[in-house]
Regions:
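N-terminal amphipathic/basic-hydrophobic helices that include classical n-h-c signal peptides
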Residues: 1-9
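Non-heme di-metal
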Residues: 10-211
Length: 211
């Protein structure tokens, strides 16, 4: 997995790992629906990786003075784009088509909770926590796919992605705590987890999307 699945070089404490708990697991029926829509799931997954890469580029260009952030996110950009290519290759191998990118209801709803009138550092914190949350939910969904798909190759394929996303979401929390007080980060993270739980309850269950 070296070279394909990057794990952050920063030391991530057990304390950080322990706070990263989604409050609501995915509905078990989701993976059953996803089995029936592999082309749509792989297409959506490819665009999730593309958006992750471009968002990391945006974070770097908006925060060039944050040296540690630049150092840690630069390899993530390369990795996420590599993931995009891997998923597209999987589509081609199966003689499936990369469809058009669709509106991401999950992410758009997360953005509604982002502080619009806070200080620059408050807005930065929310950007980091949104990324952490997206990676955490992706990790959870990839775990579902790695356990619930009929295709053994795809189960292993998604297990590798699950391991990668686990390293990513802890990285965003660790970076946030590097630049802001840990108590502030933990408090806001708890608020985000509560909001995401509510969001997951309200969203329509769909098998054609990763989120």
């Amino acid at each position: 997995m070296a070279g394909l699945f990057y794990f952050c070089r920063m030391e991530i404490s057990t304390d950080v790992k322990n706070i990263l708990g989604l409050q609501l697991p995915s509905d078990p029926r989701w993976v059953n629906l996803a089995r029936l829509k592999l082309e749509e799931i792989l297409t959506d997954h490819a665009y999730c990786e593309q958006k992750a890469a471009t968002t990391c580029i945006s974070l770097i260009t908006k925060n060039p003075e944050k040296e540690l952030l630049v150092d840690e996110l630069s390899p993530i950009v390369t990795e996420e784009w590599g993931h995009f290519r891997m998923v597209v290759a999987e589509l081609k191998k199966r003689k499936l088509q990369l469809g058009k990118q669709r509106k991401d209801e999950y992410v758009n709803n997360l953005l509604q909770f982002q502080k619009k009138d806070g200080s620059p550092m408050e807005r930065f914190l929310d950007q980091m926590l949104i990324m952490a949350l997206i990676e955490a939910r992706s990790c959870e969904r990839f775990k579902r796919l790695s356990e619930g798909l009929d295709d053994a190759y795809l189960r292993n394929f998604y297990r590798k992605f699950m391991e990668s996303e686990a390293g990513h979401y802890t990285l965003f929390i660790t970076l946030a705590e590097h630049y802001l007080d840990k108590k502030i980060v933990r408090k806001r993270w708890a608020e985000w987890l509560t909001y995401e739980k509510k969001l997951m309850k309200e969203m329509e269950l769909r098998g054609d999307r990763i989120h």
